Amino acid sequence: MADTSQRLAIVGPGLIGTSIGMAAKRRWPHLEIVTIDAGQPLSLIGHALVVVLAAPVDAILSILPELPAVIPDTALVIDTGSTKQAIISAAAQTRIKHFVGGHPMAGGTSIADARADLFDGRPWFLINRSEPDALKRAAKFVEALGATPVIFEDGGEEHDRLMAAISHLPQITSSMLMAVVARAAGPDNLHFAGNGLRDTTRLAASPASVWHGILASNREHVAPLLKFLANELHALADRLDDPVAIAAVFDEANRSRAALGGEKEPATFLRNS
């Protein structure tokens, strides 16, 4: 994409989309970038060489059927949705010739957190759909943005299962925790809380408009984890006076939290491109 006559189209200029645009400008200062927000015509994509769908999952699912009529046959289409199976399945039903499902593991709380280095050193998951040329182009693109491409070979199921555990369960747990705390303490008493509550409920500030589509499209993996967590909490509630049970929970959590640390290496079932 070094040719200054080439265009990048970003559909959905939120935190991720805006950061992609900023990172692309950092890499290719003279690149033409067009951003398309909700309600604007997709025809604005024009002759874009790369089209990035950076909208929420449910919006991406609505956009995909409309793309073939407005994009060049040679255009590479990449999405950034937090779940992959539903999106990849929907893309396969269209006439999009070069599509790669993707998911950058980077973010923030709002568009105010957008920055050019958001993806530097971060994993960017890409799903291999037996299109080696498109996958290679996508990997080069995300590398140019500073990210490390990590390839899933199974069509998105393993990605969605992993995200249910490390992203989607923490989100819904944080939201539910904040709601329960507010009911139990009373809204007028929340200002007495210390940093512990703020730290453990940071994700509770996330908008439902983004997460509805994520949770709905990954229900098969998220629901069992929620039930497992509920069962674990229920069992612990009956053993709060048992020091051995409490120690077991805290010890496992301490070890796991230490392992989380600053590690950014992909899991063993992933393969770097």
Sequence positions of predicted segments:
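Rossmann-fold dinucleotide-binding core
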Residues: 91-152, 160-163
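Rossmann-like NAD(P)-binding element
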Residues: 43-72, 76
